[in-house]
């Protein structure tokens, strides 16, 4: 059997054996998603638990236990919206190829089992939750929906999701940015019913919202030229379009009492192993034409945030330039303790960028000396550094006009 066919069959088997649609919160969303019709190019569109497999590489996905926070909470709750950079298990409950519910994903996590995080260990919001004095944030589809489960935060992020509704559609089900905001709106309504409007508004306005979205609008839309988009939008126009869409969604969050937002810029995916392989880079040099688009988006988005500050003066919003923080690690890798900068820890092909991580046999022994975990995602070690930068600019300044520690510091 040709190797590519064999690997495709393995990937299909992993999808079929690791999902069983049967619990309330996820089943409700699954039914809504199946009944959802949407024009391909539209932007703002409107318990399933994995079963145990006889394979040693699959596990029942349970809620992730958190280490005890080191201090009293600095904010009431921590809410997360985004894509695979911060998905903590949402896609475990969806019919999709974009999933991380099998080893070696999660092998270096606190529990050493896969949780749905696209990493060998923790993702940035895990580190930041502990900094805030809160437990790890549970997935919206991975809990019962009771207010008690959600009172300290919810993670709505979904791998393959984008700002554009159809971004990532070729991978299967995913929850777009707009849909995630609708899910939060539903959560807010549950809070109002349970504790009253004033108490719910006070909780939300004092909580932190972390948004990491947009990379799939390049990977699975613009760079793949879906709907002939490259002939409709030049990169500059496409970036303006995305930034405008994000700004509008933040205004929508503001209208339901959100007042503290951390908006993440996009990382240098032109340096990701997949594009090093795809563009046949001989020596691992980054794909500059891709990185130029990402830098331009971050520039446009940062300016849009400046305008939001002027329009909504009581909105505390931070923009964190992931490109700056990530490139500092890539350029100064030895300073940070890395010695493998171009190859992923797990994958197949040159730079391990041809096929994503689907088997423990594909993974390196020591992920901590790698920058990249798989085709697109950084290792736990990189996530820890980036989280430090978001919190207090420990390694390099990448957040403007302040960092998260400043945002949540008690006001005198």
Question: Which residues does each predicted region cover?
Answer:
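Conserved active-site regions of diverse hydrolases
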Residues: 2-412
């Amino acid at each position: 059997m040709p190797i590519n066919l064999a690997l495709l069959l393995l990937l299909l088997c992993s999808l079929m054996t690791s999902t069983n649609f049967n619990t309330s919160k996820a089943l409700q969303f699954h039914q809504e998603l199946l009944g959802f019709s949407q024009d391909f190019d539209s932007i703002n569109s409107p318990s399933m638990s994995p079963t145990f497999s006889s394979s040693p590489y699959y596990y029942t996905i349970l809620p992730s236990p958190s280490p005890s926070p080191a201090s009293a909470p600095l904010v009431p709750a921590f809410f997360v919206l985004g894509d695979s950079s911060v998905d903590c298990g949402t896609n475990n409950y969806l019919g999709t190829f974009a999933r991380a519910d099998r080893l070696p994903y999660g092998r270096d996590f606190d529990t050493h089992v896969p949780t749905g995080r696209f990493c060998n260990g923790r993702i940035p919001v895990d580190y930041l939750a502990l900094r805030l004095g809160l437990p790890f944030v549970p997935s919206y589809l991975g809990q019962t929906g009771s207010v008690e489960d959600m009172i300290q935060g919810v993670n709505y992020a979904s791998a393959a999701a984008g700002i554009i509704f159809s971004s990532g559609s070729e991978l299967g089900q995913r929850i777009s940015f707009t849909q995630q905001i609708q899910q939060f709106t539903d959560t807010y309504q549950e809070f109002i019913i349970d504790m009253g409007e004033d108490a719910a508004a006070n909780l939300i306005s004092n909580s932190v919202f972390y948004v990491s979205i947009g990379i799939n609008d390049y990977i699975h839309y613009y760079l793949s030229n879906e709907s002939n988009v490259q002939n409709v939008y030049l990169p500059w126009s496409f970036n303006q379009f995305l930034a405008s869409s994000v700004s509008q969604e933040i205004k929508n969050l503001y209208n339901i009492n959100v007042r503290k937002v951390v908006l993440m810029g996009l990382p240098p995916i032109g340096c990701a192993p997949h594009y090093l392989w795809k563009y046949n880079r001989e020596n691992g040099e980054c794909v500059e034409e891709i990185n130029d688009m990402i830098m331009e988006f971050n520039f446009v988005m940062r300016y849009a945030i400046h305008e939001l500050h002027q329009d909504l003066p009581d909105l505390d919003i931070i923009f964190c330039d992931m490109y700056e923080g990530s490139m500092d690690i890539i350029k100064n890798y030895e300073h940070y303790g890395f010695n493998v900068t171009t190859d992923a820890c797990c994958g197949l092909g040159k730079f391990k960028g041809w096929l994503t991580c689907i088997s423990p046999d594909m993974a390196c022994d020591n992920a901590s000396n790698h920058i990249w975990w798989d085709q697109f995602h950084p290792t736990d070690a990189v996530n820890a550094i980036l989280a430090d930068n978001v919190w207090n600019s420990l390694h390099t300044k990448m957040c403007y006009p302040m960092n998260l520690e400043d945002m949540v510091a008690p006001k005198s």
